[in-house]
Amino acid sequence: MFTYTRPVMLLLCGLLLLTLAIAVLNTLVLLWLAQANLPTWQVGMVSSSYFTGNLVGTLFTGYLIKRIGFNRSYYLASLIFAAGCVGLGVMVGFWSWMSWRFIAGIGCAMIWVVVESALMCSGTSHNRGRLLAAYMMVYYMGTFLGQLLVSKVSGELLHVLPWVTGMILAGILPLLFTRIVNQQTQTRHSSSISAMLKLRQARLGVNGCIISGIVLGSLYGLMPLYLKHQGMANASIGFWMAVLVSAGILGQWPMGRLADKFGRLLVLRVQVFVVILGSIAMLTQAAMAPALFILGAAGFTLYPVAMAWACEKVEHHQLVAMNQALLLSYTVGSLLGPSFAAMLMQNYSDNLLFIMIASVSFIYLLMLLRNAGQTPNPVAHI
């Protein structure tokens, strides 16, 4: 079976455009709020409303996919995101922006659930790792290019919103030329998110997504602060963050390929061990370039491999519900990780950022080793 089919390629093309729009807005909204001289707590509330929307969107998208299919769910998700974008220019103010960012958060989460579920349902045990690797490469590449766009174009609110909205609507176009079949609508069986979270044989995958959220959320959110406290200029901080993200992009396809060939368990063990090594190396400050590179290459690839593990433990009609559970787990981890790490850094030492990352990774490594005898390699239901 050919891995990158026409529907998959068109889906990833649409995702790239949507991710560009997401990256641009996520950066500029904070700047617009700062320019409006809003208090810090209000800026935090607007940011939190977006992530709250992510949680809400994650919860009901599975039902939507079951009712109207992948294509229409994708169209609806994109339109909701576009509405959240346009609303920022129609109504200005704390409460209105908090509402519009909540709506945008719902749309973004719906997009992620639809795309990830469609890829999982399109794949088999032999190529799901590569499909998810391609997904993450497109996502991080879109995020990276979005940051470049922010630095090259006008940042004025009414200048940005028209072309960003146009980019969102353009992201719909590729899927107008293909149809992604949802086999879940052809069965009477249904699964809930809670049932997937309780599924014992998939627990390693769920836990892996939580750990991935903690690791990536902490690195994304607090690494610039850590570097700033080391006395680095903004240009240097940007360079080192680019090294981190670039390593994550470059590591996706090899990790996905290795996971398909040698099994998820072995690759997960190696990834987590490398994250621990990278964290320890950052504490020594001996060689930041290789330390950051291996930390990014291993840390940014945990999520797709853990997701592939969990999805191989369920039946085909349960894939959408499982994907919702995994994305929810990742989101929870990405919210809790930075909050806890920031508290440790403020009260004790900046080095606790990497100590925390190494600690949670070590706990997950123990889980992987302990369960090795029970589930040596997951077998997919295809």
Swiss-Prot record:
Topology of this chain in the membrane: Multi-pass membrane protein
Keywords attached to this entry: Cell inner membrane, Cell membrane, Membrane, Transmembrane, Transmembrane helix, Transport
GO molecular function: transmembrane transporter activity
Signal peptide: none
Subcellular localization, as worded in the UniProt entry: Cell inner membrane
Coiled coil listed as a keyword: no
One annotated Gene Ontology cellular component of this protein: plasma membrane
Source superkingdom: Bacteria
Pfam families per record: MFS_1
SUPFAM superfamilies documented for this protein: MFS general substrate transporter
PROSITE patterns in UniProt: MFS (PS50850)
Gene3D superfamilies to which the protein is assigned, alphabetical: MFS general substrate transporter like domains (1.20.1250.20)
Spans traversing the lipid bilayer: 14-34, 45-65, 75-95, 102-122, 131-151, 157-177, 204-224, 231-251, 270-290, 291-311, 325-345, 349-369
Coiled coil: none
HAMAP family reported for this sequence: MFS_YcaD (MF_01149)
Record-stated family: Belongs to the major facilitator superfamily. YcaD (TC 2.A.1.26) family.
Name by which UniProt lists this protein: Uncharacterized MFS-type transporter YcaD
Source organism per UniProt: Salmonella paratyphi A (strain AKU_12601)
